[in-house]
Amino acid sequence: MAAVGPPQQQVRMAQQQVWAALEVALRVPCLYIIDAIFNSYYDSSQSRFCIGLQIFLRLLGIVVSSIVLILSQRSLFKFYMYSSAFLLAATSVLVNYYAALHIDFYGAYNTSAFGIELLPRKGPSLWMALIVLQLTFGIGYVTLLQIQSIYSQLMILNILVPIIGLITELPLHIRETVVLMSSLILIFNTVLVLAVKLKWFYYSTRYVYLLVRHMYRIYGLQLLMEDTWKRIRFPDILRVFWLTRITTQATVLMYILRMANETESFFISWDDFWDVICNLIISGCDSTLTVLGMSAVISSIAHYLGLGILAFIGSTEEDDRRLGFVAPVLFFILALQTGLSGLRPEERLIRLSRNMCLLLTAVLHFIHGMTDPVLMSLSASHVSSFHRHFPVLFVSACLFILPVLLSYVLWHHYALNTWLFAVTAFCVELCLKVIVSLTVYTLFMIDGYYNVLWEKLDDYVYFVRSTGNIIEFIFGVVMFGNGAYTMMFESGSKIRACMMCLHAYFNIYLQVKNGWKTFMNRRTAVKKINSLPEIKGSHLQEIDDVCAICYHEFTTSARITPCNHYFHALCLRKWLYIQDTCPMCHQKVYIEDEIKDNSNASNNNGFIAPNENPNPEEALREDAAGSDRELNEDDSTDCDDDAQRERNGGIQHTGAAAAAAEFNDDTD
């Protein structure tokens, strides 16, 4: 078989995209029906039977719409084929009834300028239009139901019989009988075809039910919902639903404004334009489905914003592409927490603007998490290209300036409250994060500029990052208190309580736990290094070797392990953050109570250095006893790589839950 060429692949991909777009478009009406049912009202003064009937019909509509929404592509197309055939049949019956019984084609004669009655020209033209219309309905009907050729011709003729009776000027009662018989035949045929297809519908429904039950038993409810979410392209459906709804409302509002102002100009004033925008925003989140649709639109915007920033700063990390997921989840949780869709229109607009400010700060925090690893990698790799450093520094500068501007604008227009305090705290926290990142970046760049080993660099970096983490922890505690005050005295809810618990776990408890773990790892490493003898002075020249970790010569001092291998104290300390074995022979790095008399001890190259004492332990301890350069237990100030990766997520910690927890407990 010949391989499929690129043009054929492009055609196939285009066809798949067309079918996918059509599938999404066919699922959107289900959301409109569900949204209309949820937003409808019933009169409580009616009888119980009427109220019960309305509730039953609404539940039935929701169930049927939900089933159609999750149908497979093939079943969805068949459902719309049969539905379209039914609508064509009903429309054809209505047209025949109205044309045959309610239109007098010969009542209107064209009159010339001299008052002479001419032949009826309107009647034949309407006959032809009706014949073409009914032929279109008939052909579409038999095509959608896939009726056999001979039988299909009879059905088309049955649809045209009332028009033929109208043309032949049959009496009115005969035309009524003809229309009735034609309608009954068409209805009977439709019911017969649907009854034949009922077997297929039963087996299809049973197959879907067994498949769903099988997937639920094997994979669980979560994976089943995720598979359905992706299979039906639910985010795309929500976007199309929300955008078409907003577009329709915008068209109606523009038409009403033009009619009210009695102007034919296409443009409207700025005041009217602002009123239209406010009304569209208010109506764009008036129900749970519309909030989901707005979340889907925000997801698309955030996704492409994240991709653009990643391309601009030159990052290729896959974990940084989660902005399109974190932003909509955070927005939806904020909307649920504040009861956005249930507020009055004026309050809804204010609440939405506040939620968007919180969402903006969350997005900026996430962007900082995308930028910080790139900034650190550029500084540590000693890349001197201006084109590589400028985009990251420019984004970092924007991340510092935008929170300042946002805080200034909000403080200029609003009085101090819990919501403004929370937004300001998040902005200040982001500015501190940027300062910490730029400070560490500067330290690494200074280290790369000089060729001499900077032994205290590790301590300085840890000191800067630890200071930033401590300040973040303080902000987390303050925000928890602010959220507790809001919940107790302003607007408490179950969702807010859950978010506060998540905030306390992710942004307070885990941060303390990880920071303490990092500190203890460093303290243990320092203890182990301090327990090792130090070589300095003339003994370094006798070693005549390099550090096996950094491959630099020993200029000031070196530490010797129990297995007689030499390393820089700083290099060995970094190694001990990861594991407590020797980098060369993988023996435990510790000092035993009894010194082993091992004359076979070797240095990094496996041989004893010239003029070296075969048993150097006592001499080395004597030299180390007078040394005043002992490493203190708490002077180490750089976090290890694992802890740093945990803090490089921008909004910190795991996924959207931590982001929502950090920004959700202070939304008032």
Swiss-Prot record:
Membrane topology according to the record: Multi-pass membrane protein
Positions where Phosphoserine occurs in the chain: S636
Residue ranges, compositional bias (Acidic residues): 631-641
Catalytic activity line of the entry: S-ubiquitinyl-[E2 ubiquitin-conjugating enzyme]-L-cysteine + [acceptor protein]-L-lysine = [E2 ubiquitin-conjugating enzyme]-L-cysteine + N(6)-ubiquitinyl-[acceptor protein]-L-lysine
SUPFAM superfamilies linked to this entry: RING/U-box (SSF57850)
GO BP terms, alphabetized: positive regulation of ubiquitin-dependent protein catabolic process; protein destabilization; protein ubiquitination
Localization of this protein: Endoplasmic reticulum membrane
Domain of life according to the entry: Eukaryota
A single GO molecular function term of this UniProt record: zinc ion binding
GO CC terms in record: endoplasmic reticulum; endoplasmic reticulum membrane
Signal peptide interval: none
Modification type Phosphothreonine: residues: T637, T667
Zn finger intervals (RING-type): 547-586
Description of post-translational modifications: Autoubiquitinated. Ubiquitination is induced by sterol and leads to ist degradation via the ubiquitin-proteasome pathway.
Pathway(s): Protein modification; protein ubiquitination
Ranges in coiled-coil conformation: none
Positions with biased composition (Basic and acidic residues): 618-630
Keyword entries, A-Z: Acetylation, Endoplasmic reticulum, Membrane, Metal-binding, Phosphoprotein, Receptor, Transferase, Transmembrane, Transmembrane helix, Ubl conjugation, Ubl conjugation pathway, Zinc, Zinc-finger
Pfam families: TRC8_N, zf-RING_2
Modified residues annotated as N-acetylalanine in this record: A2
Keyword presence, Transcription: no
Keyword Membrane listed: yes
Subunit architecture: Interacts with VHL. Interacts with MHC class I and HM13. Component of SCAP-SREBP complex composed of SREBF2, SCAP and RNF139; the complex hampers the interaction between SCAP and SEC24B, thereby reducing SREBF2 proteolytic processing. Interacts with SREBF2 (via C-terminal domain). Interacts with SCAP; the interaction inhibits the interaction of SCAP with SEC24B and hampering the ER to Golgi transport of the SCAP-SREBP complex. Interacts with SEC24B. Interacts with INSIG1 and INSIG2.
Annotated domain remarks: The RING-type zinc finger domain may be essential for ubiquitin ligase activity.
Protein name: E3 ubiquitin-protein ligase RNF139
Source species: Mus musculus (Mouse)
Lineage, highest ranks first: Eukaryota, Metazoa, Chordata, Craniata, Vertebrata
